[in-house]
UniProtKB/Swiss-Prot annotation:
It is found in: Cytoplasm. Mg(2+) 2 binds at residue 414. The lineage of its organism: Bacteria, Bacillati, Bacillota, Bacilli, Lactobacillales. One of its GO terms (cellular component) is cytosol. NCBIfam families: lysS_bact, PRK00484.1. It catalyses: tRNA(Lys) + L-lysine + ATP = L-lysyl-tRNA(Lys) + AMP + diphosphate. This is Lysine--tRNA ligase.
Length: 499
């Protein structure tokens, strides 16, 4: 460790000496605006398939800029790799072409430095597209050495804490975040084409609601009140439906003061949509369209590979009622009316854990999670959730024990949650009161009564279909990422000094 620290200190010293040397030669080591004509990938697209002689005849001159991530050669000839946001371009530089002063700058440049390059585009004898340098502008000095170019960052914690180094050294990671942007853009484009209006609603709430989760609490000094970082987008978006907006969506951060694991981060990105006059069947079709658009944004054929398992988003999604799914796997028929004692007995017999305050619907959901959820590999809509676990969903007309709600499962994970929204203010108040009773009985994630939201419903909300999708989990699926931290540029981390 001491030897590594000494090596690092030596490199820091040498790089600062080179910085001073540049200044002595009248060169600003942290340069100025530089105008480039092309990105590396643009040149590859234009000339990558062109014959060597044909390219030479065209006498193509290009100006690029980027970070030098490789350097080789001796004497009066050198090669380097310049990376910009689009990819890599090889440089070929000769002292007799650029002159002694410019070649000296190149020779004294370090891996990590930013260079502006002008030169002729050609192909080497090995067929690699290359720029023969005629002009070099020093743009920025890297005072610290980059991670090893062959191995990148090996410390997982460092990857998340110093994402900028991960992006420099790991092109797969860089590309994953570009895909994230493409996915979100594709979803927005799809919804905009469907006539949705994108809106922004408050992140600071007077009362946490819209989901069963613990909130973060903050304090507003001027008003002298506690406020809650939002745990969901739902209740404000429904207020907009009441106001007549009819077809709205929001993509934004939500915050939950809960545990962290490979699928959960305290702040994450949610998308919710609400459409007047839709029911949950309409929302199923909407959801399929969103997932197909996301898959097409990052694949050529709409088929995504996640951990060596292929998911074909071109095929229609399956649909099954939660009770039927449980019956298929266990033989237990929860369609039959039963008391809480009967349900608890079944749970005991099948080693399904439950809480004392649970009702039959809670136990049905526990059976689903225990025996069914992990088996759902193909995209599958599971609908008909019990009313006890769906306080904001409309009851099913034929069997009011269940709701017009679905969740989308793929490869055993849940990716979307949707309802025919509850628009009866009297029923909504009763659901909130049942949640309040659960909170009193020990469920500290149960919702409070939101009087303002109930009042909004009393002005009248049309039948509405609502949808929620966790964007980060969706991006994990579409980019074959192991952890939510791999799709968040800057995931939540414990401060290093607290270790």
């Amino acid at each position: 460790m001491a030897r590594q620290e000494q090596t690092m200190n030596d490199q820091l010293k040498v790089r600062r000496e080179k910085m001073d040397e540049l200044r002595e030669e009248g060169i600003d080591p942290f340069g100025h605006r530089f105008e480039r004509t092309d990105l590396a990938q643009d040149l590859q697209d234009k000339y990558g398939d062109m014959d060597k002689d044909e390219l030479d005849a065209k006498q193509v001159v290009a100006t690029i800029a980027g970070r030098m991530l490789a350097k080789r050669g001796k004497g009066k000839v050198g090669f380097a790799d310049i990376w910009d946001r689009s990819g890599k371009m090889q440089l070929y530089i000769r002292k007799d072409v650029v002159g002694e002063d410019t070649y000296h700058i190149f020779k004294r440049s370090d891996i990590g430095d930013f260079l502006g390059i002008t030169g002729q585009v050609f192909k080497t004898d090995f067929g690699e597209l290359t720029i023969k340098v005629t002009g070099l502008t020093f743009l920025s000095k890297a005072l610290r050495p980059l991670p090893d170019k062959f191995h990148g960052l090996q410390n997982v914690e460092q990857i998340y804490r110093q994402r900028y180094l991960d992006l420099i050294s790991n092109r797969d990671s860089f590309d994953r975040f570009l895909k994230r942007t493409k996915i979100i853009s594709a979803i927005r484009h799809h919804l905009d084409d469907q006539g949705f209006t994108e809106v922004e609603t408050p992140m600071l709430h007077n009362q946490a609601g819209g989901a069963a989760a613990r909130p973060f609490v903050t304090h507003h000094n001027a008003l002298n009140i506690d406020l809650y970082l939002r745990i969901a987008l739902e209740l404000h978006l429904k207020r907009l439906i009441v106001g007549g907006m009819e077809k709205v969506y929001e993509i934004g951060r939500v915050f939950r003061n809960e545990g962290m694991d490979r699928e959960h981060n305290p702040e994450f990105t949610m998308m919710e949509t609400y459409v007047a006059y839709f029911d949950f069947h309409d929302v199923m079709a909407e959801t399929e369209g969103i997932f197909k658009a996301a898959a097409q944004a990052v694949t050529d054929d709409g088929i995504v590979t996640y951990h060596d398992q292929k998911v074909d988003f071109n095929q229609p999604f399956k649909q099954i009622h939660m009770v039927d799914a449980i019956k298929e796997k266990t033989g237990i028929d929860f369609w039959q009316p039963m008391s809480i004692e009967d349900a608890q007995k079944l749970a005991d017999e099948h080693h399904v854990k439950y809480e004392p305050y649970w009702k039959v619907g809670h136990i049905i959901n526990a059976f689903f999670e225990e025996f069914v959820e992990d088996t759902l590999n193909e995209p599958t809509f599971v609908y008909g959730h019990p009313v006890e676990i769906s306080p904001l969903a409309k009851k099913n007309e034929e069997d009011p024990r269940f709701t017009d709600r679905f969740e989308l499962f793929i490869l055993g994970n849940e990716y979307a949650n949707a309802f025919s929204e509850l628009n009866d203010p009297i029923d909504q108040r009763q659901r909130f009161e049942a949640q309040a009773a659960e909170r009193t009985a020990g469920n500290d994630e149960a919702e409070h009564i939101d009087e303002d939201f109930v009042e909004a419903l009393e002005y009248g909300m049309p039948p509405t279909g609502g949808l929620g999708i966790g964007i980060d989990r969706l991006v994990m699926l579409m980019t074959d990422a192991d952890s939510i931290r791999d799709v968040l540029l800057f995931p939540t981390m414990r401060p290093e000094e607290d270790k």
